[in-house]
Amino acid sequence: SSPSMRNTSIDLLDAIPRAVVAIGTDYPHGHLLPSHHHRRAQLLYGATGVMHVRTEDGNWVVPPQRAVWIPPGVAHEVLMLGVSTRSVYIEPAAVTAMDARCQVISVSPLMRQLLLEAVELAPEYDEAGRDGALINLLLHELLRSTHLPLHLPLPKDPRLLGLCQEFLKRPNAHVS
């Protein structure tokens, strides 16, 4: 059996001649991934825990059973709260039909299972066999997934932005 794709970096695998690279990563609680971007598109899925994702378009709070679609080249910062990810990194040409903005999507039981399976594949999986079929089905499921309104656009005004950011940190605090 091949080594599974766990706790490795997309940077080491970006050039693999496959449309999809799937990687699973276990993060310590409260781990912050500083702002970064990828050449490939990313579907960021937390099998456990909650992710706080920040982009120029706004902030998303992403519970389990949800994933974040991050288009190619879009900078994102992620706070991991008890998260074990199963991410797929996709060649831009394979997902031209997807939205050019970040989205939170619903992950069906089938898609969840495909994501869990994908990280167990060899990096250079057999495109003509079962593994290739699994990846193709994952892409089909991604294209028909439902977008969810968990997006909080943030105001550009610095004073208002400050208030909103405080509120996001402590949503139960009433600001008078």
Regions found by a protein language model. Give the residues of each.
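Short acidic-glycine-tyrosine-enriched beta hairpin
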Residues: 57-72
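Generic protein-terminus/edge-of-domain signal
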Residues: 1-50
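N-terminal positioning helix adjacent to the helix-turn-helix/winged-helix DNA-binding module
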Residues: 130, 134, 155-163
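Basic, amphipathic alpha-helical hairpins
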Residues: 121-126, 141-149, 164-175
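Ligand-binding loop in jelly-roll beta-barrel domains
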Residues: 73-102
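Aromatic/histidine-rich interaction motifs
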Residues: 100-112
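Short histidine-centered beta-strand/loop micro-motifs
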Residues: 31-38, 78-80, 97-100, 127
